[in-house]
A protein has these predicted regions:
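Acidic/His metal-coordination segments adjacent to aromatic residues that form catalytic metal sites
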Residues: 28-39, 95-118, 177-197, 253
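Acidic/histidine-rich catalytic neighborhood
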Residues: 153-215
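Long, K/E/R/D-enriched contiguous segments that form extended
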Residues: 14, 20-49, 53-55
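Secondary-structure transition/capping motifs at alpha-helix termini
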Residues: 15-20, 133-145, 157-170, 279-282
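Extended, hydrophobic/aromatic-rich amphipathic alpha-helical segments that build helical scaffolds
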Residues: 2-16, 123-131, 148-149, 153-158
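Gly/Pro-rich turn-and-neighbor structural signature
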Residues: 2-18, 23-27, 65, 220-234, ...
């Protein structure tokens, strides 16, 4: 039964990831209505990335090609997004949602919650799918022609997006930021979504910079750029452990409005990234364990699967 379930998962990805530039969306091929839930688009604050986690490890690397086409389109629209929404003239970025036309701008109808609409990290996270493809296949031509240019463009934006921490100028943080679809409560009872220096943002940037450096090294190019990325990487604000022994999600040790919310984006460093481990960072690994204990286990999908 377990093998059947495993192969069923592979089948779902195979059947819905065959068209260049059109990866598996939120509903796959079998939507029950003309207007699919969440418009049948691509949520890139976890869903699209998670769809492709099994592609390489279950020997389906060719299924990543549709993601390549989508990201290439997003890099084009994402430059406009970076310039006109964020005032940054270098690189590209994307919000938390895209579609078959590679939309990259912040989403919503003008009165949506910033907990998911005010997020600029989608592109930086999604290009890790491309890096994973290179990491598994070691296809140097793919790295040179596809993955690295898109990763570098995402880095260009993030280098401009980072600011010095006003409380510790030696460190770099993002501002503004959110932790996707989550809200906090301050010590004074204020409820909000946007702040600065969120854990998820910095985990994504940490992974992006680290892997882009590796890509440049593999290609033997951009040595000065590698130095710049490494310098910024070393200045990123580190992980912090909260008063409950949990991994802090926010810059300050604030409570979540919903401790059992399904999104646990601040655990990205644990998985799918490997910045936190029992072997290398036991204190942070224990804090991640405590976070999961607090959050509970009430589903089998993101983020509590």
């Amino acid at each position: 039964l377990e093998m059947l379930y495993f192969q069923y998962g592979r089948y779902l990805l195979i059947s819905s990831s065959r068209t260049n530039g059109v990866p598996a969306n939120l509903q796959g091929l079998w939507a029950p209505a003309l207007k699919s839930p969440w418009r049948g688009n691509y949520t890139i604050n976890i869903n699209l990335e998670e769809n492709y986690w099994p592609a390489e490890s279950t020997n389906l690397p060719e299924l990543v090609m549709p993601v390549d086409g989508l990201v290439k389109g997003m890099a084009v629209t994402g430059r406009h997004n970076a310039q006109h929404f964020y005032g940054i003239n270098k690189g590209w970025c994307a919000g938390h949602n895209t579609d078959a036309w590679a939309m990259s701008n912040p989403v919503g109808t003008g009165n949506e919650s910033p907990q998911w609409s005010n997020w600029a990290m989608g592109g930086a996270w999604l290009v890790q799918t491309l890096w994973d493809h290179y990491d598994y296949t070691r296809d140097i031509n793919y790295l040179r022609d596809t993955a690295y240019p898109l990763m570098k463009g995402a880095c260009d934006f993030m280098l401009e997006w980072l600011i010095e921490d006003p409380h510790n100028p030696a460190q770099l943080i993002t501002a503004p930021c959110t932790s996707p679809e989550a809200d906090y409560i301050t010590d004074k009872g204020y409820r909000g979504s946007s702040l600065y220096g969120g854990t998820a943002d910095l985990a994504i940037i940490r992974e992006l910079f680290k892997n882009t450096i590796k890509g440049a090294q593999a290609l033997g190019i951009d040595k000065d750029y590698q130095v710049r990325l490494q310098s910024s990487l070393e200045r990123l604000r580190p992980y912090h452990i909260g008063k409950r022994g949990n991994l802090m999600e926010w810059y300050h040790d604030w409570d979540d409005q919903d401790w059992h919310h399904r999104h646990q984006s601040h655990l990205l460093g644990l998985y799918p990234f490997h910045q936190i481990s029992l072997a290398q960072t036991p204190d942070l690994a224990q804090a991640a364990t405590k976070t999961l204990e607090i959050k509970g286990d009430k589903s089998t999908g993101w983020s509590t699967g």
